[in-house]
């Protein structure tokens, strides 16, 4: 679930849940040889929606352009680690509404088509064919916190609005938010019965901001309206369940509010029940548990992904399945401070356990030893290039090598391993076939773009090819290991391509204008970027120069030997 298990009632009419945000220290954790995902605070109108608060395009969320400029969301995973501080602050709120037929949910509920992120003119060319399918979800609107002494205007009342506790609806402008929601549906409040508080959904600490908590309310119409807005339609619980759990590329998609409001309790259990961890399940069968890790600011956590059967356990192994289990863990990379919590989680899981590591960076493997200690029979799956870089202290026994294309069975869940080089030469992704959700490791991050590890086979040509491969797979959801999931995957991936191509063009221009050394290129290409970010930016610059050379685009008077020699001098030049 999105809220903290064991911290408040789960009953439909009592949703007083204690918000928990464990703030990490403001210092940057910097293992000197670890590269991981980073996003820098993004401010701008073109930001791709993410879960759980933002399924529409007009909400604050990660920037799909993923520019290297901090003002446009530059992502930088890598050593050494510059400090980019983003204050957590207090969570904001959003109101989502479940509007059912006159006889309740049995008569169906209303969903609204979510507006996609705005497309710019250049997307109609090369990227015009990559369009995300329609996404329907419960209607929602921002829920403003009232100022001190301010009273909400008279109007719509919600049962339990005066409830004592951390969630006090009397301090939130519920009437204004409900007005926005009803206008999306083409309804008026006079057509609705009593509004009741259904759930308070607490967003886990994905970062870099404090997140958005959601208040879910429910009402029944007095009678079904004769006409609805064109963007709205009736949905049954059974229909939503089918669209969520038996997905084909290009199908109509169902968003997270429908899942948590009407479907989730019927499909699966919470793997973090009874613990202090806050998790999020969406799509069905995929649970994200952000856990404190040694990743680079502004992120503080790495998403541990837990995939469990939604019904039954693993049966006999089919010939076409490479591996079978009752549960799959992906990237247990939490730091030692939360190894006790990781151990508790692993001990609560079925013993037929598979573990997949997308790549070798410390913030993705630091918890492997805990998993092995708790379950010595667990099977580790990873690429051979990754295993060569994982220390014996993390995993002391054998492993099963994967190269891409392997099928994995987790009870009633099917997954396909995807070879996804670029970030490193052994980087892997994973497609959750049931929901068409793509787990992308550090190829993408929930906020910003990715830096490639040039010391571990990172390669710009591979990165471009993997991005196009992901686009052709037509995923419905992107799940990164840092930050929130992205509900507009094609839009996000196209943004990554545009960003990298634009950056490569600017690097080539600086070389054509006389830049010869790494410092020359970085200082010209990133002149409007904080110098603290030049170090991580330099890793991608090296790989862009290699990519330009492989395409025979570098000027004849550009000396690769001089450029390579200047890479060792970059740090001293930066400090001058």
What feature does the model see in each segment?
Residues 2-6, 22, 37-39, 103-188, ...:
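Conserved Nudix-box catalytic region and its N-terminal flanking loop in Nudix hydrolases
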Residues 39, 65, 72, 76-96:
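Acidic, metal-coordinating catalytic segment for phosphate/diphosphate chemistry
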Residues 136-139, 322-329, 334-336, 414-509:
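Metallo-beta-lactamase
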Residues 188-200:
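A short coil-to-beta-strand element that immediately follows conserved catalytic motifs
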Residues 198-239, 252, 257-260:
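Active-site-adjacent beta-strand/loop module that shapes the phosphate/pyrophosphate-binding cleft
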Residues 271-348, 429-441:
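Conserved beta-strand hairpin/beta-sheet module of binuclear metal-dependent hydrolase folds
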Residues 300, 334-411:
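Active-site HxH/HxHxD metal-binding segment of metal-dependent hydrolases
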Residues 509-576:
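C-terminal regulatory/interaction regions
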